[in-house]
Amino acid sequence: MVDHKHLNHVKEKLLENNQKYEVSVEDIQKAIDEANPKPQEDLDERKGYRLTWNHYHNLDDIYDYLNYLEVIFPTICTVSTIGSSVEGRPIKLLRISNRNPNNKAMFVEGGIHAREWISPASVTYIISQLTSNYDNEASYIKNLDWYFVPVLNPDGYEYSHNVDRLWRKNRAKNKISNCVGVDLNRNWGY
């Protein structure tokens, strides 16, 4: 992928070196916009929660869905805030549990990379399947405490929805440079 500001330079270098090239997508932003149309009309008609798996959703829709599940399935679902992002957004966790104190834990997170929208969608789909079929699940599923964090990087996720679709990192400010953001799963001390 080549930024339009550098396109002529790249073309010249390719031609100088007798390299063939083909433009696959003329306007990547247009292709991105067409791939994820605004789902507002689809959502306005819905009763209950606003989440579908026909579109990618913003952070508010995902958090509203978690809160909805806590109301609909109060015996198994609990929502809590486990922290906040650098911009002050809550990081929400959904626990699905039969409340057996002997249960082992299963932790599932998504949305660590802002632009990978399929990750929160996959996590919320798993949540949907687990909650809607919980009574029929096998004991090895029900005898776990499930902990889901659908969006571990809420600032980056919202930024990728509203400003820069290809943004990957969080939105942390760097004190010694103008570089914004940290790639969260590459910033561990080990």
Residue positions per predicted region:
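M14 metallocarboxypeptidase catalytic domain recognition
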Residues: 1-190
